[in-house]
Amino acid sequence: MLAAIAFARPVDFDAVHVDGIRHISPLDIHYADELGYKIKLLGQAKRHAGGVSQTVRPQLIPKSLPVANIDGVLNAVVMRGSFVDEVLLVGRGAGGGPTASAVAADLIDIARGIAPPIFGITTGHMQAESPANDTVPESKQAYYLRVSVKDEPGVFADIAATLRDHAISLETVVQRGHEPGQNVPVILTTHPSSETAMRSALATIDAMDTVLAPTQLLPIMPA
């Protein structure tokens, strides 16, 4: 709905790429914090020449960004425009007071006969063309990976070689000491790359006998 308001066009809700937070583990939160990030569930909509891309998924956000510090009942909306650059709106999104205020505002509008269109303009004035997410050019971004592997010689070399073969370069590698024979998480962050290349590389990595579980993949928001 926010995308429809922002871009004055009907949005194909079925085309929104959605990943939840169920697969986020305490390990991810710990290593994200160690690397200088917080994990937040973000909904994003971007307008491109080919349409509007929409995603809802957890991302690593640098602690230096204001949106990283939105916690508790607070919600935030970040807007980026051609002339105003970036605007951040923060407010309470839960609780008796904020909910009552929103309901009261709607009731007052109804009593006054104020009935603006849901999306700010009538649907007849929205741009008729479909966003068609498949026509949106793919952008590049950095990624966080957590790979659970067996403690065997050459495992990391195989993973690094696979990423290299898909033109993905590494920025950070974290592997903590452990007892011999134990399974170990390997934490990687990459330089910006396409998600298509990343998922292709992970299909190969996850098929390795030394990789014990599907690799955790989270995008990293640029600072």
Q: Over which residues does each language-model region extend?
A:
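Structured core elements
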Residues: 40-41, 55, 78, 88-90, ...
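A conserved regulatory-domain signal marking ACT and ACT-like small-molecule sensing domains
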Residues: 102, 107-223
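Glycine-rich phosphate/pyrophosphate-binding beta-alpha loops
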Residues: 85-87, 91-97
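Short conserved micro-motifs at the rims of enzyme active sites and ligand-binding pockets
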Residues: 67, 89-91, 101-102, 158
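A glycine- and small/hydrophobic-rich beta-loop-beta segment
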Residues: 76, 82-84, 113, 117-118
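Substrate-binding/catalytic subdomain of NAD(P)-dependent oxidoreductase enzymes
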Residues: 1-69, 74-76, 95
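Short acidic (Asp/Glu) and glycine-rich catalytic loops that position anionic groups and cofactors
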Residues: 6-12, 80-87, 138-139
